[in-house]
């Protein structure tokens, strides 16, 4: 069974990134076991490889970090559960298929949200996980941005639990103008991070066997 490691407090993004990269190298060179980091970051904007500088609107005193993950700009901060799976897609029980991996991530998060009574969706041509907030109007509740090195995955998923959503106004999230962002709290679901973590671990084992 894959070990989930919760990093305490509000983790610095760059420190966590180095932790991930070091462990990815160990999986590749030393065949270390797969693990999943659960993180709650201090406030930071991160940019993926497809970012456009004009999508960074007004970041104030929040640091901006340019990363090697896929995607565009997003925000990380307190109240957001960030999940970093370090999985070896080249292992016998996995598949060397990045699209399939992302699809499985989506299914994992959708099933976890469904446990709390939240009906979530994927939308064609829009990365991430979405919920309907009004008729024909959707808001993003989770962002996905991954990277793979020699078929070992890192970066991952960020789910808004009780995030300060006003911080997303400093960017165009994921490059989608006029898109809404939401959280479990905003949807009326108040859950402790530890309780949410139990569910994502249970649901992970159903999808990534």
Curated annotation (Swiss-Prot):
Organism of origin: Rickettsia conorii (strain ATCC VR-613 / Malish 7)
Keyword Transferase belongs to the record: yes
Name of the protein in its database record: Octanoyltransferase
InterPro entries the UniProt entry points to: aa-tRNA-synth_II/BPL/LPL, BPL_LPL_catalytic, Octanoyltransferase, Octanoyltransferase_CS
Subcellular location: Cytoplasm
Keyword Membrane: no
Record-marked site positions (Lowers pKa of active site Cys): 140
CDD domains in the record: LipB
